[in-house]
Amino acid sequence: MKKQNPWISLSEEEKNQIFNFSESYKKFISKFKTEREVTSYALDKAKKRGFIDAEEKKNLIPGDKIFYTCREKSVAFAIIGKNPIENGMNLIVSHTDSPRLDAKPSPISEENELAFLKTNYYGGIKKYQWLSTPLSIRGVVFLKNGEKVEINIGDNENDPVFVIPDILPHLDKKIQRNKKSDEIIEGENLKILIGSLPIESKEQDKVKLGTLQLIKEKYKIEEEDFVSSEIEIVPAGTAKDVGFDKALIGAYGQDDKICAYASLEAIFDLEEIPSKTAICFLVDKEEIGSTGSTGLDSRYLEYFVSDMIFKIKKSEYNNLQVQKALWNSKSISADVCAAINPIFNSVHDAQNAPKLGYGIPIMKYTGHGGKVMASDADAELVSYIRQLLNKNNIAWQVATLGKVEEGGGGTVAKFLASYGIRTIDMGPAVISMHSPMEITSKFDLYNAYLAYKAFYKE
């Protein structure tokens, strides 16, 4: 199935559309780097587009635009469709968490008169990639009186940045040079340099005390308050065009905020009432298995679908309607996939691997080895998606996650499929996935938006 590079056949007007769409995305991905930040952004934009908190609605009719917020870290947007909801919905589910470092509950320490922030890495990172790179600290802290304090340090013009200092090559021979990549630094040593000025004190750890004093002066945060916090450490810096032609985007967190952005824009841009109820669901915790009360395994999906159906059916509501609505639904697990990286092309089956700039990849299954932990979309659903994309002249390509037994991974697809929802993975291809600088194609981003919008309209 050889295809010509789609860029070649594009008009200048089409190229301008793609580049203009990407500029808005770059601003988004540069500013909103955590799941809380993306949720807040999405809610603000949705309200401007006419979406209303579902808690304020007692009845729902076709055309109503509503949202459900799950503890400020997951959010679902829905447009009630013309058809009976028990006949099925069209869902697109992406995740807004990305691999990162999280501060420990008691994080601040001092070693050799330098103050550090102790961390626990979150998700599948290559630990060595986080050494000697500028870092930003973001999150929330709840003070002892319950007051919520938000932190965002490292990306504003006059902000300091933070760093995990690496060992110099002159002294790394025994401690690092001959180790495997995942042993170059131990997880326990992913400690972030946050201060060096001591204060006058009779106590030890004068630099730590000085750092804590500065934090208290600016944020009212005391050392014990970190126990009730969610502090995330992410790469500092903004999204950049990659290459002389500027056709690629380099940024942190594109897994999976590129899909979150495309699916949000798609549902916001729906001009007519869809036939089926359209749902855009942004979830948390995918990178660690979709666990926790804000992950897809929490059954929040079932909760808000039940609430929608109750507000549609009222006295005629019953649980069977919920089960039918889920069973008859189709969903896109909107998550990125691994593009061929020519430097490491031996891990891919080139005939079944996506390329940057060839359109949105269709991934029938993920998992590892013998399709273990995969949902494996049925041929009927793949046929439906293929026809949908072709009918709307949307560029697409096939994708698998590397050669058989080379490795593997998973998405939220299996959790959606557990409800009986027919599910397929479909999201842009990425080079350097899970790194501080992931690379995507502007063409693929735009075609993801077109694909998601076409799916909602069906």
Curated annotation (Swiss-Prot):
- What does the record give as cofactor? Zn(2+)
- CDD domains tied to this protein: M18_API
GO cellular component terms given for this protein: cytoplasm
A GO MF term = aminopeptidase activity
Question: Which Pfam families does the entry link to?
Answer: Peptidase_M18
User: Which residues take part in binding Zn(2+)?
Assistant: H95, H170, H434
What intrachain disulfides are recorded?
none
Q: Family per UniProt?
A: Belongs to the peptidase M18 family.
SUPFAM superfamilies to which the protein is assigned, alphabetical: Aminopeptidase/glucanase lid domain (SSF101821), Zn-dependent exopeptidases (SSF53187)
Enzyme Commission (EC) number: 3.4.11.-
Residues folding into a coiled coil are none
HAMAP family registered for this protein in UniProt: Aminopeptidase_M18_1
Q: Domain of life here?
A: Bacteria
* One GO term of the biological process aspect: proteolysis
If you read the UniProt record, what top EC class would you report for this enzyme, in one word? hydrolase
This protein's UniProt keywords: Aminopeptidase, Hydrolase, Metal-binding, Metalloprotease, Protease, Zinc
User: Which named protein is this?
Assistant: Probable M18 family aminopeptidase 1
